[in-house]
Amino acid sequence: MASVEPYNSANEYPCYQEDKNKCGGFTRLMYMIITEKNHKNGYKMIYSHLSNKKNVKTINRQNNCGCTALMIAVTECKHWCSRKTVNLLLSKGAKVNLMKNEKQTVLMLASLNSRQIGSTDIVKLLLDYDAKIDISDEDGWTALMYASINSNESSTIATVKLLLNRDADINKKDNQGKNSFMWACQYSNTTSNIKTVKLLLNRGSNIDELDNNGWTALMIACKYANTTSNIKTIKLLLDRGADTNIKDKIGLTALMLACKYANTPNSIEIIKLLLDKGADINTGNGEGWTALMFACKYANIEAIKLLLDKNADINAKDKIGLTALMLACKYANTPNSIEIIKLLLDKGADINTGNGEGWTALMFACKYANIEAIKLLLDKNADINAKDKDGWTPLMFACVYANIETIKLLLDKRADINEIS
């Protein structure tokens, strides 16, 4: 039952039970629908109202939110009104393809809320009344997308099946370039589920389709594996032959994403899965960064150990000459950073190589003032008087960036105080 004040055309009322915001422009018919179950003869009142041809003429009027009486009735036919009311509205000429302000149709609302409504009957009924199945809202979402992304919450997998059986376009994309399958993969651990992912795959979804950023479903699942998606989804995609080496528009691969988001549960297992399925461990993104570089930047020591054990190139350089060791020194004020630097050095990282400007790992450590990193590098025989292309030494970096403790340490280690750039 809806708890609302008496009808007044100037008042605002809720369109849906879960809607905290109220809306103006309600017709008397809309009001009668949200209060149908407030009265023993609520349906009869609506039937009587629509027996008047004058009232039927306004059956498709939209309120200030763009909702029609049919939209409200379809969404609330289990709570505020009855299914008989939905049937009545359709029989009296309620239009099924009008859009709300956000361009949602009544079919989208029914598909989104089929679990709350109680069955897929309303969705089927709307389709029988020629509701357009592939029409998109302002975000490019279709009824199938709404059902797929919410199949474990407000919608159901039965709704997804129904829409597919009625020839919903499984490959249609939204404004982000994502289709129903990609969305199901992204939310397979929350509002959607693995059964929906399997269903969409079995019905012909292209497993390696790209969104506007060049991301595949596998990339999406890797990014969200410990939030809205899960490792089961990744395993399924890999078992179904998802390409592990597709690159997005900036050159990222699924492995790089797994390493970037590696400080989460299951991350090491995900990286292992990708490597076992042929992920290229040494390929670089658009900037030349490898998976190892991402792991070093984001300081996941277990990921770094795994990559090194799988023969990641420890001395690979990006397009400006950065190595994994330089990145570890640059981001040395993070957890595990000293342990990571030690690991890289123990595994053969070149301590004195320079980037495109001639900067060494020690220079990065001096610039970013991580005293423990500097001590470790010096203990491992880093060249204390190395010069970059401008003739700068680590001591000069420390002086320019006013790192007093670093300056003292370098002088104690006999840095050349008289060197000239």
From Swiss-Prot:
ANK repeat windows: 24-56, 65-98, 102-135, 139-172, 176-209, 213-246, 250-283, 287-316, 320-353, 357-386, 390-419
Q: Which UniProt keywords apply?
A: ANK repeat, Repeat
Source organism superkingdom: Viruses
Q: Does the keyword Repeat apply?
A: yes
**What name does this protein carry?**
Putative ankyrin repeat protein L93
| Species the sequence originates in | Acanthamoeba polyphaga mimivirus (APMV)
One short Pfam name that applies is: Ank_4
